Amino acid sequence: MDPVCLESIQLMSTNTPLLQAERVSVSFGGLRALHDVYLQLNHNEVVGVIGPNGAGKTTLFNAICGLVTPDSGTFSFEGKQRSWPRTDQLAELGIARTLQGVGLFPDLTVLENVMIGAQKFAKTGLISASFGRNTKDEAELMDRSMTALERVYAGALANRRANTLSYPDTKRVAIARALVSEPQVLMLDEPAGGLGPQDIEWMNGFIRNLTSHMSVLIVEHHMDVVMSVCDRLYVLNFGEVISSGVSDDVRRDPAVIAAYLGTGA
């Protein structure tokens, strides 16, 4: 193929949004949670979805993760419109997530917790169907899991029981479990929640470094926490996007200031 044509195809691929959700509406028992919400995540960027409590952030996160079925709206991945994903389709698409509640098995070791993530990934068919059924595969599964732990600087915790970890360490392990599938998109629900300033600084630096390999979507309540790490922000209030754009512009938007001061949207 002509090198110029190849370069054009690669450029088009890069410019195509990795993930798009458009005109998303969700209601629960007649109560509107989201109305006409849109979101776009590009390749190798960090996008934050922020807003006051009850703004609809987690509902949007759950819709993309297959935990909530929207009443209306479209979902596209790599430029192709698809049906809204189910939770068991996320790994196949290349999406991994961590939830606010972390969700580690307390009586298992850290390594065992991450290996569970690898086993779930194997069941998608993206790894050999026989993966994990013999000693060789189990060793590979363990290696993959240890690599994920080392990426979050938690390799030394591998043999610790999950219920003995500090809260910041449980956050790291939960991210390692998501990274074991080597996703294109990592979705993080309140990654800085409950962390002190030093741990937040570490988390933001770590997330920033991930963008050489993937895109990251963060749902967060506190705007200041994500300002330094996000390329772009979407601000929700009362189930609608009230502002979006680069972080500095969003921070100065009067609608955003009003929403966070509680004086209305």
Regions found by a protein language model. Give the residues of each.
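Conserved catalytic motifs of ABC-family nucleotide-binding domains
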Residues: 182
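Helical segment within the ABC ATPase nucleotide-binding domain
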Residues: 200-212
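The feature captures the beta-strand-to-loop junction immediately N-terminal to the Walker
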Residues: 50-52
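Catalytic Walker B motif of ABC-type/P-loop ATPase nucleotide-binding domains
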Residues: 186-190
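Helix-to-loop junction immediately C-terminal to a conserved catalytic motif
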Residues: 65
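Conserved ABC ATPase "signature" region
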Residues: 125-157, 205
